[in-house]
Design a protein with these regions (language model features):
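Short polar catalytic/cofactor-binding loops
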Residues: 7-14
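Catalytic domains of carbohydrate-active enzymes, especially glycoside hydrolases
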Residues: 16-38, 104-107
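Extreme N-terminal starter segment of soluble prokaryotic enzymes
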Residues: 1-4
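Glycine-/proline-rich flexible loop or hinge segments
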Residues: 39-45, 73-81
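Active-site acidic/histidine proton-transfer and metal-coordination neighborhood
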Residues: 17, 21, 56-57, 61-65, ...
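Short, glycine/acidic-enriched loop or turn micro-motifs at the edges of active sites
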Residues: 11, 34, 171
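Glycine-rich, proline-tolerant flexible connector loops at the mouths of alpha/beta enzymes
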Residues: 32-58, 115-119
Length: 180
């Protein structure tokens, strides 16, 4: 078993300093945030996918410290009821897939997302019970949105060689435990 860490815990450090620090602690693998809530402190796919020199510098820095990248992490809410926010999170997640493809990884880590309770919602609505009946109706609506989104996203990921999508089970999102 190898020890790994999400690099965003030291997002205030440049990537090289972060990797040097992790190496000194015996860390062997890193999960690198590249959008959404983790931010892009150590990996900005929009830059690295289009600037070969910066991409090579990124790769060389990881290699210099003999680190393995376990996954690119892009936790957001691509089904947020605010369409602008949803589009931004979706773009980050798709860029994470493209970054994984370029780097030769087959996995990204993310959240499932959580829609609102109806088409006119402005904020996510995290429902954790199916009764009284109103909640069951909300869950039906939400899971339709969730499944439709993920069918499309999984197809995109597969087209780009990403065959593992790890959903972090987290409160506030539709997938928050093993039963969901």
């Amino acid at each position: 078993m190898k020890l790994g860490v999400l690099t965003n815990v030291v997002g205030n450090m440049p990537l090289e300093d972060a990797l040097k620090y992790f190496k000194s602690m015996g860390i062997q693998m890193v999960e690198i945030g590249c959008g959404g809530y983790p931010g892009k402190d150590h990996c900005d796919p929009e830059v690295l996918l289009h600037d070969e020199a910066k991409y090579q510098e990124f790769c060389d820095t990881i290699k210099k410290y003999d680190m393995e990248v376990s996954a690119f992490s892009c936790h957001g809410n691509p089904i947020h009821p605010n369409k602008e926010l949803a589009a931004a999170y979706d773009k980050d997640m798709r860029n994470a897939v493209l970054m994984a493809e370029k780097y030769g990884l087959h996995q990204i880590n993310c959240f499932s997302g959580c829609p609102g309770d109806c088409e006119t919602s402005q904020y996510p609505n995290w429902v954790v019970c199916a009764w009284p009946d109103d909640f069951g109706k909300i869950l039906e609506y939400q899971w339709k949105i969730l499944v439709d989104y993920w069918k499309d996203f999984v197809a995109f990921a597969r087209e780009h060689g990403v065959n593992k999508i790890a959903l972090e089970m987290h409160q506030g999102f539709c997938v928050y435990n093993t039963e969901t």
